[in-house]
Curated annotation (Swiss-Prot):
The lineage of its organism: Bacteria, Pseudomonadati, Pseudomonadota, Gammaproteobacteria, Enterobacterales. It is an enzyme of class 3 (hydrolase). InterPro entries: MTA_SAH_Nsdase, Nucleoside_phosphorylase_d, Nucleoside_phosphorylase_sf. This is 5'-methylthioadenosine/S-adenosylhomocysteine nucleosidase. One of its GO terms (biological process) is L-methionine salvage from S-adenosylmethionine. The keyword DNA-binding does not apply. It comes from Salmonella arizonae (strain ATCC BAA-731 / CDC346-86 / RSK2980). Homodimer. PANTHER family: 5'-METHYLTHIOADENOSINE/S-ADENOSYLHOMOCYSTEINE NUCLEOSIDASE, 5'-METHYLTHIOADENOSINE_S-ADENOSYLHOMOCYSTEINE NUCLEOSIDASE. The keyword Metal-binding does not apply. It catalyses: S-adenosyl-L-homocysteine + H2O = S-(5-deoxy-D-ribos-5-yl)-L-homocysteine + adenine; S-methyl-5'-thioadenosine + H2O = 5-(methylsulfanyl)-D-ribose + adenine; 5'-deoxyadenosine + H2O = 5-deoxy-D-ribose + adenine. Pfam families: PNP_UDP_1. Catalyzes the irreversible cleavage of the glycosidic bond in both 5'-methylthioadenosine (MTA) and S-adenosylhomocysteine (SAH/AdoHcy) to adenine and the corresponding thioribose, 5'-methylthioribose and S-ribosylhomocysteine, respectively. Also cleaves 5'-deoxyadenosine, a toxic by-product of radical S-adenosylmethionine (SAM) enzymes, into 5-deoxyribose and adenine. Thus, is required for in vivo function of the radical SAM enzymes biotin synthase and lipoic acid synthase, that are inhibited by 5'-deoxyadenosine accumulation. Pathway: Amino-acid biosynthesis; L-methionine biosynthesis via salvage pathway; S-methyl-5-thio-alpha-D-ribose 1-phosphate from S-methyl-5'-thioadenosine (hydrolase route): step 1/2. The gene is mtnN.
Amino acid sequence: MKIGIIGAMEEEVTLLRDKIENRQTLTLGGCEIYTGQLNGTDVALLKSGIGKVAAALGATLLLEHCKPDVIINTGSAGGLASTLKVGDIVVSDEARYHDADVTAFGYEYGQLPGCPAGFKADDKLIAAAEYCIRELNLNAVRGLIVSGDAFINGSVGLAKIRHNFPNAVAVEMEATAIAHVCYNFKVPFVVVRAISDVADQQSHLNFDEFLAVAAKQSTLMVETLVQKLAHG
């Protein structure tokens, strides 16, 4: 099995990259892909860059060049569920765009023409992630993760997301684009991210302060999940 892992930022991939043995680097289209073994399991780790276009481009390059069997999207996210705090884990059961609107033509808010309203994560990957959460004794929430090309930092953007997606547990900038590409390629995916901030007016300050905490927690989760997927 080869496992694809995607993070947007240097801070989100550096701890995992340092653990990859026999590492080789491919630089293509503004993305970096690191291949090798993580605790004996073949992995391809992508640093995509921030935002939906960068994530979609990188995910496509990763799938085409490395042919992973599954995709794990890792990194940080803004918490929307009331029980979440910095360092907690969110696991996707679905991903949707929060900034797409073609409702004038009868589509659901967040749905693009020719696409489902949301992109469902793989049940087996979700179950494996939840097993790892129990093993690591982490606080986590599973649910809808929404994505858009905006850092949510205040009441207006937050209120709009809560209105359109009242069940969303987290918000970030890449996951749905990655899920969209995986859907088109028919490759199973799951989003496993750690909370770096609560999406409020102080979120930009919290993000800068707690990104390292989120990166450490998400790395722990991904490393454990890779082991679980490879060895059962």
